[in-house]
Amino acid sequence: MTTRRTFLGAASSLAFSNLFSPANAADPNKTGAASMYADIVLHNGLITTLDRANPNATAIAVKDGLFMDVGTDRDVMVLAGPDTKIVDLKGKRVLPGLIDNHTHVVRGGLNFNMELRWDGVRSLADAMDMLKRQVAITPAPQWVRVVGGFSEHQFAEKRLPTIDEINAIAPDTPVFLLHLYDRALLNGAALRAVGYTKDTPNPPGGEITRDANGNPTGLLLAKPNAGILYSTLSKGPKLPFEYQVNSTRHFMRELNRLGITGVIDAGGGFQNYPDDYAVIQKLSDEDQLTVRLAYNLFTQKPKEEKQDFLNWTQSVKYKQGNDYFRHNGAGEMLVFSAADFEDFRQPRPDMPP
């Protein structure tokens, strides 16, 4: 049966030019009459092959996620049978699927449906209107979260919202805005939800800004360690498991929309194996992945890295998995001391000026 995954699987393979050689194409004459025809044929297009020996293809035939042929319409259309899905590209360009070699699909997918995106929003007024509308439909105890993807420089006003502006829109719904890796803005409801008070100490490398009376204002700063930002965000409610499955599917669909068909997942903080990989494993087991995903495992405990790695190697081996989901080794850090701090404008406290 032709599926979105079948097509995307072929598209991601397009990035490897040797797959276009005859030795790597499926031969319908060798696979029997029942397998002679393609699942999908794209024709009448402009195919970017990345193959110098075959740079001007106009059609592609795909079966079981593999190329049967890449060439001219005349050559490829003979592989179309009565059940083949035929797509007339009408002269449009087909590009190789993009492979992102550092992203966080496993972690990001769990929360994608909970996040409001300000990517590409041209004015702060529009962004705040989006925030207001999201607050109106967000049920308690969930937060409204804008987790990066924007900068004040994209807004016509050339500034970030103030805490007072956020409080006016959301007096009772927690709001968390992450700006790059240098700061987070929390409204009063979010401060109450996380329990930050005048008695809450600053964590190492982070600052809870305070008013004249010592009460938190809602501005958190990485100075220079962004741990305060991540740890605060992690205090928010999680989605139920089945909602996380749905959220991850939406995240992958967004990646597909942008042309991404393969990723190296870099692990990341607050991402423990195997508990936090249950959702992506379920999607893999059910053949629901629409990106090829090679995942790294990231140590979670400073000074206990060796034990983390020993625990993992007892349950998962390097390259264990399949073409769509496999273990890719350790990363993104091997030891915590290897990490630099994210706010590069701040001096490192452990290094001389």
Q: What residue spans do the PLM features occupy?
A:
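N-terminal secretory signal peptides and thylakoid transit peptides that target proteins
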Residues: 1-15
